[in-house]
Amino acid sequence: MTASAPAASASARLLDGRRIAEELLDGLKLRVDARVAAGKARPGLAVVLVGGDPASSVYVRNKRRAAEKVGIEAFDYDLPQGTSEAQLASLIDELNADPKIHGILIQLPLPGIPDANRLIQRIDPRKDVDGFHPQNVGHLALREFGLRPCTPRGIVTLLGHTDQPVRGRNATIVGVSNHVGRPMGLELLIAGCTVTSCHKFTPPDVLEASVRNADILVVAVGRPGLIPGEWVKPGAVVIDVGINRLDDGRLVGDVGFDAAAQRAAWITPVPGGVGPMTVATLMQNTIEAADAAGIQDSGFGIR
């Protein structure tokens, strides 16, 4: 069954991630074209997929299409189920040393690999275009923008397409994953928000109160309908990162969309909200990594 994005009510305006991502990709293509016209190397992105998980294959296909659209050269590494951690580590070492590769993407989860963090930490931080390496997250914590985690950075871009201020607002993040919730808190702190993070140990009454107080609500848990739409503060901006497939084949988020759309000023659809922005931001990071590599190669960068 093909999922389609829900339509917002008259109360809320849709934050159309597909449209905004396309605009971002169009601008990135101009950057790549200008780079190549100036005689610089075309940005190169290594895409590593292990096994044949259908969801992972779809995500990787979307990323490869985006790379082709903007003119990034994608180097595909489709590895069989059962590929060992040692084999992946050896591949990462090769990619780290390859000057044609400016970005390395390891599609998660990695089947049969109990601790993917060891492999993430093996990636050269300058090629970590997912923004997951501890060094890059540390730079974000210090307000030193470099390669930032893609989903939070994409959400910041989405927020910039609303008519709502960010600075001085109350922001609530539900979910504290290393790849979304935690760096999202850093992004919103840097943007000037007062940030509340909720997680599995947050008492239900505190969760509800935190959601009701949020001018900006970001939910990234992966549980359909976790946040009732009736909890949404009138006039809030709702960013629903969750994507969940129901038994009837529909894709839904973590927030009750219909009720939330009656109260929010802006809301992301599921699908078609955050996901396309994550992919577009990955391309943005890859181009920035290529630009930074050129500075380092010229002798003006810090190695």
Curated annotation (Swiss-Prot):
Pathway: One-carbon metabolism; tetrahydrofolate interconversion. Signal peptide: none annotated. GO terms for molecular function: methenyltetrahydrofolate cyclohydrolase activity; methylenetetrahydrofolate dehydrogenase (NADP+) activity. InterPro entries: Aminoacid_DH-like_N_sf, NAD(P)-bd_dom_sf, THF_DH/CycHdrlase, THF_DH/CycHdrlase_cat_dom, THF_DH/CycHdrlase_CS, THF_DH/CycHdrlase_NAD-bd_dom. GO terms for cellular component: cytosol. Its EC number is 1.5.1.5, 3.5.4.9. PROSITE patterns: THF_DHG_CYH_2. NADP(+) binds at G175, V176, S177, I243. It comes from the Bacteria. Coiled coil: none annotated. It catalyses: (6R)-5,10-methylene-5,6,7,8-tetrahydrofolate + NADP(+) = (6R)-5,10-methenyltetrahydrofolate + NADPH; (6R)-5,10-methenyltetrahydrofolate + H2O = (6R)-10-formyltetrahydrofolate + H(+). One of its GO terms (biological process) is methionine biosynthetic process. Pfam families: THF_DHG_CYH, THF_DHG_CYH_C. Keywords: Amino-acid biosynthesis, Histidine biosynthesis, Hydrolase, Methionine biosynthesis, Multifunctional enzyme, NADP, One-carbon metabolism, Oxidoreductase, Purine biosynthesis. Transmembrane segments: none annotated. SUPFAM superfamilies: Aminoacid dehydrogenase-like, N-terminal domain, NAD(P)-binding Rossmann-fold domains. NCBIfam families: PRK10792.1. Catalyzes the oxidation of 5,10-methylenetetrahydrofolate to 5,10-methenyltetrahydrofolate and then the hydrolysis of 5,10-methenyltetrahydrofolate to 10-formyltetrahydrofolate. Homodimer. Belongs to the tetrahydrofolate dehydrogenase/cyclohydrolase family. This is Bifunctional protein FolD. The lineage of its organism: Bacteria, Pseudomonadati, Pseudomonadota, Gammaproteobacteria, Lysobacterales.
